[in-house]
Amino acid sequence: GCIPSFGECAWFSGESCCTGICKWVFFTSKFMCRRVWGKD
């Protein structure tokens, strides 16, 4: 399966985001799936 946008993810895990990439989100202090274009 894949992780939906804004789902919590781990860059070191084998999971992949449905759309976008797994990146650090400062205001949540977590890694989350975000769209590459920066417009979620």
Swiss-Prot record:
<keyword id="KW-1015">Disulfide bond</keyword>
<feature type="disulfide bond">
    <location>
        <begin position="9"/>
        <end position="22"/>
    </location>
</feature>
<protein>
    <recommendedName>
        <fullName>Mu-thomitoxin-Hme1b</fullName>
    </recommendedName>
</protein>
<feature type="disulfide bond">
    <location>
        <begin position="17"/>
        <end position="33"/>
    </location>
</feature>
<keyword id="KW-0738">Voltage-gated sodium channel impairing toxin</keyword>
<keyword id="KW-0964">Secreted</keyword>
<keyword id="KW-0872">Ion channel impairing toxin</keyword>
<dbReference type="GO" id="GO:0017080">
    <property type="term" value="F:sodium channel regulator activity"/>
</dbReference>
<dbReference type="GO" id="GO:0090729">
    <property type="term" value="F:toxin activity"/>
</dbReference>
<keyword id="KW-0960">Knottin</keyword>
<comment type="similarity">
    <text>Belongs to the neurotoxin 19 (CSTX) family.</text>
</comment>
<keyword id="KW-0528">Neurotoxin</keyword>
<dbReference type="GO" id="GO:0005576">
    <property type="term" value="C:extracellular region"/>
</dbReference>
<feature type="disulfide bond">
    <location>
        <begin position="2"/>
        <end position="18"/>
    </location>
</feature>
<keyword id="KW-0800">Toxin</keyword>
<comment type="function">
    <text>Blocks the Nav1.2/SCN2A, Nav1.4/SCN4A, Nav1.5/SCN5A and Nav1.6/SCN8A sodium channels. Shows a slight preference for the Nav1.2 and Nav1.4 channels. Reduces the peak amplitude of the sodium current and negatively shifts the steady-state inactivation process. Does not shift the threshold potential of activation or the voltage corresponding to maximal current. Does not change the reversal potential of the sodium current. May act on site 1 of the receptor.</text>
</comment>
